Amino acid sequence: MCIRDSNKTIIIDSKSGYSGAGRGVHKKYKDKNLYESLSAYGLANHRHNSEIQQELDLKTGKKNKFHFTPHLTPMFRGILSTIYVDLKKGININKIIHVLNYQYKNQKFIKISKINTFLSTNDVINTNNCLISVCKSKYKDKIIILSAIDNLIKGGGGQAVQNMNNYYGFNQSEGLNV
């Protein structure tokens, strides 16, 4: 079920800890004392753009437009994304919560929060969880989706363990903290 107006552009604004950018950036932060700095990067050519495009198109069966703006923040780990979506006519926030709860009902590591819950990367540190919150916009035809993960667990080793468990038919949480 498509819940968004597919003629509109999705805006994805992601804030990431510098651990996800590699050793070079970690050294740059340390050497140049950039711990009080926030910076955007990879606007038109970020390495995840093609993956985002692929998954959006696969889910909707058509070409989608989106803008992905990643930012490096002065924190070591975690990713907090804010996603702005235009709704399809007749869709409201309660329907979206229903769809998300149905879609992820058997996923131990995806947690759907109550409407308008503000998320923090601290909510997921040292977990394999992805927290999702759907928030109301001041416009009735738009929503704001928040998601938070620990990029060193869910974005790395924890996701690899979960995928291996799924591949070999183990319980997906085997070896992971739930």
Cite the ranges covered by each PLM segment:
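A short alpha->loop->secondary-structure connector
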Residues: 5-7
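C-terminal substrate-binding/catalytic lobe of Rossmann-fold NAD(P)-dependent oxidoreductases
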Residues: 9, 13-14, 18-145
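Short, small-residue-biased leader/transition segments that mark boundaries at the very start
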Residues: 1-3
